Amino acid sequence: MSNRTSVLLVAVAALAIRVSPVTAQAPSFEVTVDPATRSTPLTGRLIVVVSKTAQPEPRMIIAPQGPALFAIDLNQLRAGQPAIVDTKSALGYPVPLAQLPAGEYYAQALVDVYERVTRAADGKTLWLPMNDGTQQVMQIAEGNIYSDVQKIQVGKGGTVKLRITKTIPPTPRPQDTEWVKRVRIQSQKLTAFWGRPVYVYATVLLPRGYNDHTSVRYPTVYTFGHNIPFNFTPDSTRVRNIGQINPVTGVETGFDFYKAWVSDTFPRFLAVSFEQATPFFLDSYSVNSASNGPYGDAMVEEIIPSLEKQFRMIGKPYARLAEGASTGGWQTLALQLKYSDFFGGAWVLQPDPIDFRRYQLVDIYTDTNAFVMPNTQLTTTERPFRRTVEGQLTWSLRQMSLFEEALGTKVRSNYQLTGWEAIYGPLDAEGYPKPLWNKLTGTIDRSVANYMKENGYDLREYAQRNWATLGPKVAHKLHFFSGDMDDFYLNLAVYRFEDFLRSTPDGKRVPFTYGRPMKGHSWHAVTWAELVRQMGAHVRQHAPAGEDTKAWWY
């Protein structure tokens, strides 16, 4: 190949990169809800999912790396009335409908159904995807409706007709077992806030000998995840690689943890996980929130006291421990800081941003745009949202924001970025969460950033502001863990939290453990069994004089 030809091809390739392809004749979608499926007017988010494959069903693989989405809001759509999704009406991800490349696809319509709710706390009337407190994404949420999968051809224009005929049924709740008990607790505080019953679900893992040692009370670890604590399972047929440590996560299988849990001379704990979904996200983060309600107060004043009445828990601060990773890591630290006298220890693993000067890679107090960083006087570069442990960019923050906006307007995506806004942020004039940045332009709203700081959601800032009283209470209770190449750049805020603590007398001894090299978001420093052993030793070390710390270690 001649040099001249090479230069020409490079120039053509560069032009192709700069100019997005446009389908000459993009299709439109005419979506109708069968009156037999729903006869009443429908408000919600209609998403037409367009995939290159028929299986799994397109709706079941909705994700940032998944199929194309084309979405519109529905406002009291009458049964049988068609909704039009076209190049003018639809927000598209990852490309506009007009830029969907020609070819063969499989299309499916899904509606995230909204319910009209008047929030008792402020009297605001909202349209929201409600739930009963269990963790349900829109693809499988009870009451949402969808169509069959239909093969389509893109590039020839025309109208694709999709008919919604199916309703997602309730998901059966797991049954209690010998080891695992499930409890539903109504919160009066949250019920008063919403003006309707609100529940928190707890999954309680019993220690070996719980039914035999009837006079023993146990320390409790609250694991802020949504599954059975520590992935516990006595069924060896449900797991692979028994006896091996996962090279990525650093933890054992659920069956190997079960063997440790029931072994001799293992510290006997009760372990509890929670489901506390809100209309805006899969988890409340266990804090009081303008949008979600007083989940923090509910947790420490209602939910945990209720569990302590139902199970033989010691029920004293030294014997209440918190542990969590990612979402759960942020919750764990927030609970230990905001209810410092209630919990006796916090194991904070790869937490969501705990210093908002590193809200992932965004400084929400000084940056003006979340999507880009200046790299010269005249140009900018895209800000990443996720990377591999080798540093390869997988999604940009612009892509993630567009994805969430496609899932739901008015902070109703039920995904991560809008979930944070509903937890940390103020309300807009209508009563919906106020976005931290515009999801299409990236422009940061500094008033929202300042609200988050002033109301204590930037946990480093909150701790620093209150450290004179917090330090002596919590420094000996904190333990931090993070991989050096966290997929979502969460280690950067952990470094800044450590810098603050190292500047204080109380904080100098707080342990920070980092996974190196190339340890990502799911990394753990020790196995689950070893973590519980460390927790047992911590409880013994910090138990007040006169407390029996031998009865539960058998």
Regions flagged by a language model, labelled:
Residues A36, S51-Y554:
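Non-catalytic cap/lid and distal C-terminal segments of serine-dependent acyl enzymes
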Residues A24-Q55, R184-I185:
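Mature N-terminal segment immediately following signal peptide/propeptide cleavage
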Residues M1-S2, A24:
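Initiator methionine at the very start of the polypeptide chain
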Residues V7-L8, V22, I354:
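Short amphipathic alpha-helical "recognition" segments used for binding
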Residues S2-V10, R18, T125-T134:
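Sec-dependent signal peptide recognition
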Residues L15-V22:
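C-terminal segment of classical bacterial N-terminal signal peptides
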